């Protein structure tokens, strides 16, 4: 314990940064949970896709053409928010995908406020999908 106190006093900025980072992670995780957003890990997203969910990639067309999930439709976020009925029919689930999962989670929040309940976001976005070595296709 004495070594920890000595290390902390000698590296106050490092320890402060560590605590600030930990608090930020906790804050953002709680924020996502309180928004009632269902962010799915890549393996759970695969199960959702296999059950027939609509997959919507909200990234721009250039990024979409470089690599996307095979069954994904490319609909920009602004268009999706204007015409949410394009996402899914009643009682059908939809999975939103972006680069990191942040924009798709925010978009899912807005869509839920518009009454679309069966909407999910890919946690970590396409980057998390590729980290799991799951397939992507390019145009």
Name every feature range the model reports, one short phrase each:
Residues 1-39, 43, 48-51, 61-93, ...:
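Rhodanese-like catalytic fold shared by cysteine-dependent sulfurtransferases
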Residues 55-57:
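Structural scaffold elements adjacent to functional motifs in cytosolic proteins
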Residues 97:
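Short, surface-exposed ligand- or partner-binding patches at beta-edge/loop junctions that are enriched
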């Amino acid at each position: 314990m004495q070594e920890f106190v000595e290390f902390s006093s000698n590296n106050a900025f490092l320890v402060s940064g560590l605590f600030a980072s930990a608090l930020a992670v906790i804050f953002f995780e709680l924020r996502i949970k309180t928004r009632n957003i269902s962010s799915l890990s890549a393996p759970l997203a695969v199960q959702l896709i296999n059950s027939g969910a609509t997959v919507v990639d909200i990234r721009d067309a250039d990024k979409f053409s470089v690599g996307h999930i095979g069954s994904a439709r490319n609909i920009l976020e602004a268009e999706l928010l204007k015409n949410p009925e394009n996402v899914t029919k009643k009682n059908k689930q939809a999975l939103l995908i972006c680069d990191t999962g942040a924009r798709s989670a925010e978009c899912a929040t807005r869509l839920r406020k518009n009454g679309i309940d069966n909407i999910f976001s890919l946690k970590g976005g396409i980057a998390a999908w590729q980290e799991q070595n799951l397939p992507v296709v390019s145009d």
